[in-house]
Amino acid sequence: MEMLRRNLKRQASRSLSAFAVSSPRAGAVAAADADQENLHPNLAAASPPMSPAAKNSSAAPGASPRSSKPVPTSAAPPSKAAAEGEQASAPANEAPAVKVVVRVRPTVSRPVDGKDLFFVRKTSPCSVAVGDRSFAVDGFLDDRASQADAFDLIGVPMIESALAGFNSSLVCYGQSGTGKTYTMFGALAAMVDSSSDHADRGVVPRVFQNLFAQIQGRQESSPEKQTSYQCRCSFLEVHNEQINDLLDPSQRNLQIRENAGNGIHVENLTDEYVSTVEDVNQILMKGLSNRKVGTTSMNLKSSRSHVIFSCVIEAWSKGFSNGFSSSRTSRITFVDLAGPDNDELDGGNKHCTREERYVKKSLSKLGKLVNILSEAPETQKDDSPHKQSCLTHVLKDTLGGNSRVTFLCSISSEHRCRTTTLSTLRFGERAKLMSNKAVVNEISEDDVNGLSDQIRQLKDELIRTKSGDTEPCKNGYFSAQNARESLHNLRVSLNRSLILPHIEVDSEEEMDVDEEDVQELRDQIRKLHSSSEDTFDDFMDAESGDDTPCSKGNPKTSEEDDQPVIDDCEDPIQEEHEVLSSTKVDQDLVSDRKSFLSVSASPHLSPMQDPTLCSSPKIHNKARKSITSPGLSPSKLSVSDCPGDEVSRKSAVRSSLQSSKLSPTDSLAASLQRGLHIMEYHEQNQGPRKSFVGLSFDHFALNPRQSVAKVSSGVLASPERKGATSSALCSSCKKAIDTDGNQKDNINAEKQIVIATSVVPEVKDDITASTIASKRQTELEALCEEQADKIKELSNLVDQYKKCSEDAQNSDGTEPTKELVDEAKVGEQHGELNVNDREELLSEIQRLKDQLKQQAGESTNVSLLEHLRNGSTDQEYELDREREKWMESESKWICLTEELRVDLESNRMLAEKTEMELSNEKKCTAELDDALQRAIYGHARIIEHYAELQEMYNDLLERHRRVMEGISEVKRAAAKAGRKGCGTAFAAALAAELSTVRIDREKERAQLKEQNRRLRIQLRDTAEAVHAAGELLVRLREAEEASTQEKERSAAMQQENDKLKKQLEKMKKKHEMEMETMKHFLADSRLPESALGGFYRQESEDVPEYNNHATSTCDDDQSWRAAFTSAYE
């Protein structure tokens, strides 16, 4: 290898720059020393023999044969600028499907007969002229263009198209010796030393160097998706209408296969996976060393076969955000066609070899195919023009198929090659008229979904077939047409060897999406929502429609408790104003509850179960239906009068400060927890990102409520003020006060915490609340001072009356005597009371006894707030303390809400972070699995390759052993023969042994041929059997469909016959009924014989004057009557 590298460097040092004009000496040295077909064309071309005169003139001193260097036409601008202009005018996504580029090789000979060597000129950026003939092209590279210019014009668009998913091809066409192979592959020295930027590198090495660089850049600069690339290369040649594998010379005469899945491919062609430029260079050097070359008049080492170098680029991309994956497959094809030789120099003396005939034949077929494809589609007669030769068949996608193709027409500017140059340009002009249909070779999620639907249909058809259902589906997959297509694919794929299976990048779990599971999940969610809506409706109906009283002593209170919760603060004020319209003080005190803890229900409340209603310490000492679950019965909701029901009341109400074991903060925290769940549910369902909890504690002024006993005592103690307070403190009004108080407590009990939809204007509420609070505080203080005096007087009277009542119950005397004693005591202390007042006091005392007995069984577990309402309003400091207590509770609740919100946000952020880490871990795991799968696959291929090498090594070792044994036997035979006189005998013995071996090999070959023939016969019989079975299956399917159609037709005819029979039966029945009706009518209209006889005699008497004519008339009448007599009878 080191010696080869030195020789190649030595040759490269003697060569000139790419396509530069060489001197005669350099041309002579190159013609003598060049032994590589892909060297510089100036060096590889052989100069024509010079005449002696020319030799003398060149040898003369001072003679400079190249002193006057031919100058090309000025119409040709610098090729680099032209290449940049052409590249900018045709972007990758909008590039034309077919392009033609012309490259001119510089001349290596001198003018002959004064003719101009540079007869090719560029007239415009899109046309080239040869004499007076103009040709349309897409690019032009003159004799001064370098390999880098050719790559910029040809290679860069091919790379962009390949990475975009299009198939791209480069076809080099031209005369032998015009530099096609040099333009395509460059010099071998540049391939060996791939690390340096060699000027002689061809288009193919430059393309792959740029391709791998762009692939690496795309993988590093795509954070939103993961992209993996894989490249595999193959190298073949078409020699004498046979396809040979250049990477494995033992693979010869390969066959071309075509199917719907893989398209056009060569059977058993070697594919090598590449990842660097060095891998590609190794493949190129190995393939080019096995290529068929020969000597022509234009080139010492001319290509005598067409070579095709293909690279398949597979790209898999998977997005991180949506998880969708897609795959792209593109193919880059480089075609180096062998050029025809110029016959003008040798004329009839040139010997047309077999290789030359095949080259010309294949190029002729290629020209005919281009002519056919350049015509209009309606004028094309041949349906399969590509199958005329192996070259056109392999290039089916390149020529008129799914590919973007660039034709590089290599021409010579010498006048002796004028005819071949015109032929090459005409070929390029016709090729430019072809219409290729290049599409992006991509498999996306939609294709996978379509295949999933097809698989589902196939499964349904298979299940239907297994179940015995012979009725075919109208839109099923197993129809007669699809069966015919399947049979055709079976025939095409018969006798075909197995192809290496494609590597699945993504697993089935990632790609397969079951639509049935998704639909089932949607149905479950929909049922859950509907059940939640039904539960919510039932809950509201049970709350608003239940009429079970909650207290036996207050029936009116139970009716008012069944009313729905009032969110607005003005409606309860209006109701209280209607109930207590007679007392102005009570109206003012009722207005103190204008603001209480309530949050209006959101109109966008989600269809799920409502949160449990929050209970307030202001609630009355009884249960509420609105704060319990809908499943509780009315018996559980009602409050028992005995103290033993305290446990059930605690579990149902969770309200009163004394009856509940929880503090106000814990009670509110338990209620807020459900509300926070609702807030999180709204945020997850694309609701407002931030919800507001409205907690209104504007005023907590307590309504002073007096007990029934103390109110009654107030009436007795102050008879002079009865007119001022009798309307509010009488027996009937007392019930109204109790009812209203219960209603107010129930209103306060309905304090709820629900999600609010908007922010309440807090500034306005604070100003209004402060104004109302100051006003009510003044009124409350005046009322407290007024009531303080009453309480002091009434308390003494109540104590005395209680003692009297106790003495009356314990004494054995009569009731009137004790009442008189009580009256005497009262008269002593209050002498101003008269007799009427005493009677009224006695009646009030009796009523108080009854009420005391009734209240004795009630629960004494009354909250501090209830005590304050029932008579402790005289103590102003207790009112202030209660207000401060609730303000502190409010601040604690607000702080607790904020803390819960902060904790919720932190927990949500932690959950999102954890979910992100989990997704990253899953992605890393998937990447590792993919890498492991690829590594396993590559290791398997390495093991298989190693096993093949081991088998080959064992075979070679066995052959070597046999050869050494044969050599040893020959040596022994020679030793036995001696030195003199035995040479003839030894030769005869050796010839006999060789003939014996030859005979054995012939026998073995004959046996193998016979075995091969039998196997072919069996294979043909098997193929025929498979064909027959497939045809039988198709015919059975068609017959089944025909029988099904006939059954349907017969069923339709049977139905029609049944309808006709039913109609006939109906007509028969109708006819019979009509006949019966007619007979009935005839029977009703029958006349007696006497009537008929009288009528006959009357007619005979009326006509006596007629003789003959009358007689005939009478006979006719008689016959007529005789005919109808039977009908009348």
UniProtKB/Swiss-Prot annotation:
Q: Which residues form a coiled coil?
A: 994-1083
Q: Which domain of life is it from?
A: Eukaryota
GO CC, sorted alphabetically, is: cytoplasm; kinesin complex; microtubule
Q: Where is the composition biased (Low complexity)?
A: 20-33, 44-93
**Chain intervals with Basic residues compositional bias:** 1-12
Instruction: Could you list this entry's UniProt keywords, alphabetically sorted.
Output: ATP-binding, Coiled coil, Microtubule, Motor protein, Nucleotide-binding
**Binding sites annotated in the UniProt record for ATP:** G174, Q175, S176, G177, T178, G179, K180, T181
Q: One matching Pfam family, short form?
A: Kinesin
Q: Where is this region: Disordered?
A: 1-93, 527-567, 623-668, 1093-1119
What GO molecular function annotations does the UniProt record carry, in alphabetical order? ATP binding; ATP hydrolysis activity; microtubule binding; microtubule motor activity
Q: Where is the composition biased (Acidic residues)?
A: 534-546
Q: Name one GO biological process term.
A: microtubule-based movement
Give every Kinesin motor domain span: 97-434
Bias (Polar residues) occurs at 626-638, 653-668
Kindly give the PANTHER family that the UniProt entry links to this protein.
KINESIN-LIKE PROTEIN, KINESIN-LIKE PROTEIN KIN-12D
Similarity field: Belongs to the TRAFAC class myosin-kinesin ATPase superfamily. Kinesin family. KIN-12 subfamily.
Protein name, per record: Kinesin-like protein KIN-12C
- Organism equals Oryza sativa subsp. japonica
